[in-house]
């Protein structure tokens, strides 16, 4: 059961690597950086509060792990509304849980024996290393197009994280990393126990159950997903077909419609073995699509055409709306005389906010080569 204690540790184990002060401190730095830069005010507040007396907190976690007494407190399920879609089932865990989960991730990613299970040249999401992430994925798509791909199918694995067969993935890891104490800690770190199930009501069914699913919002979830889809990545590449995957989004490229559709069918069969499925590209929704490469297509927030990469129209519209929201808020001052004394300061804050939005968006799409779109 989640929250249970774990056995005492033995020497020279993966478990010992997790509970070293060095690993915990490195894990905290990542948790702090992610939290303090979050767009959620509550997340920033929680991280700031935890940072007060951080050495005391880390020492407590270290000693609890060392004695096998660390417990993962229950998390909260947050259904994030999405227009025209089911809510996104985000799991918000306490800071100490995030620190230990991040420490476990650091140890897993530093285990050479595990790399063949998740480091594939066409998989880019949730993998530590240079040239990965969205830029690496989109650039590889563009390379396949320039190499002669004529047809594509893009799709999204439906409810991926909440349907991952966790026990199967943990068994794969156990087959490579022989350390019972570490395996026990990993199982508890990836279990999802929510303390607000009654509040969630009907939305509770969107969240992971005991054996199926991992938490959206947990740093370990992308790695577990990549390990599960090892065979998907390997079997869908070759014989003229390229399949680029970023977590649950993927695009299949090939020389003609027949071969690409056959590859997609094979992919569905592989996913079905794990109780997963992908959206139907024939419906041409935001989640999936198919067609000739020469007409262009969207993938990971980018528009890809032969030799040209640019931010997708939806992404461009989103940044304009973000700037407009900031400007609209500043205009409230003009209608409230009692706030006019602060107008100069507010104007500076507004300009700084707009600059930050544009800089962040520009950095996000700096790898795009369609300069005309970027100038707009």
Located regions from the model:
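Acidic/histidine-rich catalytic neighborhood
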Residues: 277-311
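Active-site and adjacent loop segments of nucleotide-processing enzymes
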Residues: 298-376
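Conserved polymerase palm-domain catalytic core
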Residues: 143-247, 251-274, 280-281, 291, ...
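An acidic intrinsically disordered interaction segment
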Residues: 58-76, 185-191
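Active-site-proximal segment of RNA-dependent polymerases
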Residues: 14-17, 105-165
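Inter-domain linker/hinge segments that demarcate the starts of reverse transcriptase
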Residues: 61-66, 261-275, 316-324
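Non-catalytic, polymerase-adjacent accessory regions of viral genome-replication enzymes
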Residues: 1-64
């Amino acid at each position: 059961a989640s929250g249970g204690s774990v056995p005492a540790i033995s020497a020279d184990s993966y478990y010992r690597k997790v509970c070293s002060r060095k690993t915990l401190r490195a894990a905290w730095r990542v948790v702090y950086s992610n939290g303090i830069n979050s767009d959620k005010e509550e997340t920033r507040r929680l991280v700031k509060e935890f940072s007060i007396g951080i050495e005391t907190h880390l020492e407590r976690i270290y000693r609890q792990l060392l004695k096998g007494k660390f417990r993962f407190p229950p998390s909260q399920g947050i259904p994030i509304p999405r227009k025209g879609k089911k809510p996104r089932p985000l799991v918000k865990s306490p800071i100490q849980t995030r620190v230990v989960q991040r420490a476990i991730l650091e140890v897993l990613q530093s285990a050479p024996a595990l790399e063949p299970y998740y480091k594939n040249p066409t998989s880019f999401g949730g993998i530590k290393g240079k040239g990965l992430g969205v830029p690496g994925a989109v650039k590889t798509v563009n390379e396949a197009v320039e190499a002669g791909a004529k047809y594509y199918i893009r799709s999204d694995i439906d409810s991926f994280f909440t349907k991952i067969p966790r026990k199967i993935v943990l068994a794969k890891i156990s087959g490579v990393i022989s350390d019972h104490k570490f395996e026990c800690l990993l199982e508890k770190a990836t279990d999802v126990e929510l303390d607000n199930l009654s509040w969630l009501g009907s939305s509770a069914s969107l969240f992971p159950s005991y054996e199926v699913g991992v938490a959206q919002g947990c740093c370990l979830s992308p790695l577990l997903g990549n390990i599960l889809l090892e065979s998907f990545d390997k079997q869908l590449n070759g014989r003229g077909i390229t399949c680029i995957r970023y977590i649950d989004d993927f695009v299949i490229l090939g020389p003609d419609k027949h071969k690409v559709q056959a590859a997609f069918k094979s992919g569905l069969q592989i996913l079905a073995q794990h109780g997963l499925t992908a959206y139907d590209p024939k419906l041409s929704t935001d989640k999936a699509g198919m067609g000739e490469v020469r007409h262009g297509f969207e993938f990971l927030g980018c528009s890809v055409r032969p030799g040209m990469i640019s931010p997708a129209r939806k992404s461009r519209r989103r940044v304009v709306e973000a700037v407009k929201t900031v400007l609209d808020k500043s205009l409230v001052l003009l209608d409230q005389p009692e706030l006019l004394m602060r107008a100069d300061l507010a104007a500076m804050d507004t300009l700084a906010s707009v600059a930050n939005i544009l800089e962040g968006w520009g950095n996000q799409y700096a790898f795009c080569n369609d300069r005309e779109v970027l100038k707009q």
